Every structure is written in C-alpha cells, then in structure tokens.
C-alpha cells in the first residue's frame, strides 16, 4: 500500500494493450477527421460523425455517415485510408512496423503482444512474420491498384490514380 492506501500500478495484458490501441487509434482518427481541413467544405465535422467514420474505418466495416468521395477532402480521405490500413493490419502489427522503421529494437513484451495479436505459435520470428505480412499486404494492394488503374483513369483522369489506390486498400 502507498500513502493513499492503494497501489494503482498494474501491468496491462496483451489483450488490454490491443483494445487500448484500437480505442486510441479510433479516437485520434475521429479528432483529426473533425478538423475543417478533413472536410471538402472546410467546416468542422460533428464529433459523432467523425467518430463513426473513424470506428468504421479502423474496424474495416465500410459503413459511412457521409459519402467518402464528396464529403471528405483529399486530406480526410487520406486519414480514412490510413485508418483502414491500420485496422486491416492490426494496431499491434502497425506499432511493430513503426518500431522497425524507427530502427528501435523490439522488446520481449512488444514481441509477446504481437504474438497474441496474430496468434503466432512462438515469440521467435515475429519481426520476420511482420515483414512478411507487410510485403504480402502491399503486394496485394499494388496488384489491386494496377488492375483498377486503367478503368479509373479512363473515367476520372488523374484522379483515377487516387481512386484506384483507395479502392484497392479499402477492398
């Protein structure tokens, strides 16, 4: 016991870390989507609409309150695309990716959380598995983009490039 009578320090389980990670990404996404720069009309988006959109993107459900192509600006669409990507890869996989990109070593606790997140049989090889997941994901998205590119560019010009990328990632 401490002076206050309670000891509040507690270790979070891997499951709790994943839940908090998802909730944090959803909340951050909602706050960014509320900004005027995220809406094509350059007006503030109500919190409940931004939260619904962010939650739907991270949970990759595809439900929307506003039409993505007309309501959101290019910035807002990019935020939604990143939320879809993080949700699709998983918050823990995305976190390990950022750690790898920063050049920082991944701790045993982080490897253990990743093992739980992807149901890996062992902690060993988590970084290699993460690289495999990322390469596979981006390869499939690249093939999808290249397949959609001719039709979208024919119908929408240069805007079709962005549309092909967005549809490939969100599919």
Describe each model-derived feature in a short phrase.
Residues 1-171:
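Membrane-proximal intracellular helices of multi-pass ion channels
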